Amino acid sequence: MNENLQELIPTKLAAAIANPLFPAVDSQLRSGRHIGQEYLDNFAFLADFQNELDMFYRRYNVELIRAPEGFFYLRPKATTLIARSVLSELEMLVGKVLCYLYLSPERLAQQGIFSVQEVYDELLNLADESKLLKAVNQRSSGSDLDKQKLAEKVRAAVNRLRRLGMIHTVGEQNSGKFTISESVFRFGAEVRSGDDPREAQLRLIRDGEAATPDSLSQEKSAVKNDEEIEDELDEGLGEEE
């Protein structure tokens, strides 16, 4: 029996699956979470068994990717047997802003700590406020209520990205303070080779904002699978709980 299993499952893969860290790491990856070096044990586990686990996940038509910045995540193919991870247009835009902030001088000045309010303010500063408001309400008049709704959607987007391992809460859960992980570079692949990374990311934000207000407002129909998102990132444009 054991000999037959060894023929079917390579020894190192069997060791990976038997590792006590595997169930939690597997669950996180399948939910769309990104695992970076800040997760010491989980990251070391993935680094040690990267090739074996990639072979394991390919049976489900997904790939275990290690990005140039070091973090791990699963990228599904069109025929994936694992539920696809998706993001709305607005969540992708907020992700681009987070990447922009990660590259900013303020990150060092503020010891890497940002707030949801800063994300909201930066989004309004970099993108067209009127288009963003119309994404919340097509008949937006720029009222305080419309701005409040937009702020709520931005906060929800930040929380979604937190669950995906893009940011990490600082202090109390509801403090609104967080640090930004390198995994936000999923939203800025183009900046890896740009002469000026921050300017390149600014272009990505403006390109994303340049999408029609209709595409931003139709969040339910605007979601894309993770593989499509990766293609858009590579082209210079831009998961499930």
From Swiss-Prot:
Lineage: superkingdom: Bacteria
Which keywords belong to this entry? Answer: Cell cycle, Cell division, Chromosome partition, Cytoplasm, DNA condensation
Its BP terms in the Gene Ontology are: cell division; chromosome condensation; chromosome segregation; DNA replication
Give the Acidic residues compositional bias ranges.
227-241
Give the primary localization class. Answer: cytoplasm
User: What Gene Ontology cellular-component terms does the record carry?
Assistant: cytoplasm; nucleoid
The answer to whether UniProt assigns keyword Manganese to this entry is: no
Annotated segments matching region Disordered: 207-241
Localization, per the record, is:
Cytoplasm, Nucleoid
Classification via InterPro entries: MukE_C (IPR042037), MukE_N (IPR042038), Scp_MukE (IPR007385)
What does this chain do?
Involved in chromosome condensation, segregation and cell cycle progression. May participate in facilitating chromosome segregation by condensation DNA from both sides of a centrally located replisome during cell division. Probably acts via its interaction with MukB and MukF.
Q: Give the similarity note.
A: Belongs to the MukE family.
Q: How does it assemble?
A: Interacts, and probably forms a ternary complex, with MukF and MukB. The complex formation is stimulated by calcium or magnesium.
Q: What is this protein called?
A: Chromosome partition protein MukE
Organism of this sequence? Mannheimia succiniciproducens (strain KCTC 0769BP / MBEL55E)
Gene behind this protein: mukE
